[in-house]
Amino acid sequence: MLGHTRVTVRDGGPADAVGGVVPRWVALPESLEEVSVVLGACADGGLAVTPAGGRTKLCWAAPPERLDVLLDLSAMHEVLEHVAGDLVVRVQAGITTARLAEVLAKSGQELALDVPFPGATIGGTLAAPSPGPRAYRYGNARDLLLGVTVVLADGTIARAGGKVVKNVAGYDLGKLFTGSYGTLGVIAEATFRLHPLPADRRWLTFGCEGWEDAGALLRSQLEPSAVEIDHPAEGLTTVAALFEGSAAGDRAEAAREVLGGGEVHADAPSWWGRPPGLPLASLRCRVAPHVPEGVSVRGSLATGVYLASGVTDLDAWRSRLPADARLVGLAGDFTGDRWGPIPSLPLMRRVKERFDPERRMSPGRLAGGV
Amino acid sequence: MTVFDRLEAIFPPDRVITDPVRLRTYECDGLTYHRATPMVVVLPETAAEVAAVVKACAEFGVPFVARGSGTGLSGGALPRSDGVLIVTSRMRRILSVDLDRRQAVVEPGVTNLAITEAVRDQGYYYAPDPSSQQICSIGGNVAENSGGAHCLKYGFTVNHVQALEIVTPDGEIVEISEDDFGYDLLGAFVGSEGTLGIATKITVRLMRAPEAVTTLLAAFETIEAGGQAVSSIVGAGILPAAIEMMDALAIEAAEAAVSCGYPADAGAVLIVELDGPTPDVESQLAEVIAICVATGSFEQRVAASAEERAKIWKGRKSAFAAVGRISPAYIVQDGVVPRTCLGEVLAGIDALQTEFGIRVANVFHAGDGNLHPLVLFDDTAPGEGERAEVVSGRILDLCILHGGSITGEHGVGVDKARYMPRMFTDADLDTMQRVRCAFDPGGRSNPGKVFPTPRLCGEVPRVRKGSPGEIF
């Protein structure tokens, strides 16, 4: 404990590194006010800060150009408000998605986000979103987010949105901060829309030759919650579709007929929602993509959002993809441009300048030094 | 050289309007009690023309306002008498439809319904369905983040737009997409009410039409009983496509206007629409009917055909206009409360009616707590308009008090900017202003909307030098 602030601070070590950059200190605030105090002090001292939660994706995106303070939010893990009748929950950003799921399950509810890493926090799930199978049905983190409390680089506490599912008052800062990788400020609290846990779930899995085979499912009216593909570097490609609801079994059987084969299971296949290994890249492509030799791809045929591993030369792969596809190196070593084209980068840079003119918040974690 | 000269160089004469009589056509949007005659109106046909106008505005320091079909209910498209009104009504091409990608790319002047009409025969549709969908433009929907009755299940415009081409307030043409790695600028732009630039190309998600759709009308003696049914439906884990409620006064108005034939003597009616795969819809319908009966519904009607479904919806969709039959004037309010507070807030609105002697008809998207109280008054009776205005404002206070919002779907616009400080702190508003300054440092894009007081952007602050504080 240092100073009158009572915020716990310790020296940083190799285990605290962000993409190989070791912070001088680690601060462990326990409240929104303490986050503000720490950031205010960092502003006074010109210190560079990177927020962290479950640390499951600190190796994603680029390492910070400099890092003095790792702001560890893991002590902020409270459910602040859960009104089951409203299907809304407000939490501190450091709560893990697994812990939140436990709490909500007691009321028969869930935050309908599939998070690939156990231990990931809500803050990290917003700041560094990862694709999940059921995004097709429920949307991504940004779609389920209703309100947010952020702390800016100068310690300012600001809120946007609210705790009702329908609200268009003011700019949606929550969405702006989604995907920000700690470069705009710190997400301290968040409010989400919840869904009732489905009465039943069934997975239909089938091996296939080409990616197009699953198209019939997407053209059907069976409303799968997710349609995922597992395309390993070697071996058979598998497609799996999830059906949710009281008639899940009937719909999975109907889907089997549409496809002319496959197996219906009560449990997800082992690869469901799990990222392939390093080096890891994010692929967004709305049509069946070309996949190079030695590359494995997993993700949603329904949304066109995938994770890929085994790719070494990003530029070479990019040149074989449609112009509107996006391939970004998330974690590991790559050759070629890590980011690829980002047409809105000049606007992102202007937003960064307004939120963090001193470039102290995770500087350089995103493209173009943002 | 003036801005007029520049505009006349950009456009042929028939697409620059300066005639005072014709200008008055554009003096208001759907919120008719705010009016201003624009200095000049232009009718661009391409993004390049929009960019050229915006650049001219930058050069001459003139503000601009974009307008689609002018159906907005918060004065978001209210012109500036010292500014250019950029009307997108000539940008109405559907540029592409790609069902393999389940996407359509359209220009901003295309109407909401035209997108669905273009793909309906193939079994697809565009989900957000504001009541004005026959005429409202998709560009306006993007600006306002429009909802509609079915957003309970399917979400709002922001959940269905995948990419935008925008003209920034500097006049640059930029693409922002959900696929861009980094900040969700798309999410920030949708719903920014024209203050961050003008969308000139919109990529929307198309959805497969549901296999089955069924609509139930349930009548209750009291609005409380109807509210209880809503809570029980949601509590049972059912997510209908829409749950709408109308109170006795709204029913009376709808009956007078369109003879919708809702059960007589109902204190409230619920419209519940379920859609999805047939087996799910059938089991959920049985469950919903059982819940309505258990909570005191005395009559339930299930639409047996598309015509019957349309008839049930007719009363609800005509409700706003219908109150014109029972009141000389009215204010359409748009507030949101947590669903569990509906009862308390309705009791509060009731108390306001008694206190001020002003009638309020209630129409609402009950499933998501979005109230549309229609505050009725006689504009010829001295003082009644003012009292109605007070009641309208007090309803918003009730919403805020219960943790809700001052607008669920109509937007802040010019109408509610003054209420923003009741919902947000100065720090909140200043932080939003940083976004505004990043996009529009000159404050030329739809100024005077959303935010209560104009704030200057100033220069980006310079790097501070100091010593570490006492924590470190």
Predicted regions and their residues:
Chain B
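FAD-binding subdomain of flavoenzyme oxidoreductases
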Residues: 93-97, 103-246, 463-472
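Activity-critical C-terminal alpha-helical subdomain
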Residues: 417-472
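C-terminal substrate-recognition/cap domain of FAD-linked oxidoreductases
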Residues: 18-26, 207-208, 214, 219-391, ...
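Conserved, mostly hydrophobic/aromatic
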Residues: 57, 194, 440
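Alpha-helix capping/hinge segments and adjacent helical runs
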Residues: 12-13, 400-412, 436-437, 441-448
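N-terminal flexible segment immediately upstream of the FAD-binding catalytic core
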Residues: 1-55, 72-102, 131, 248-259, ...
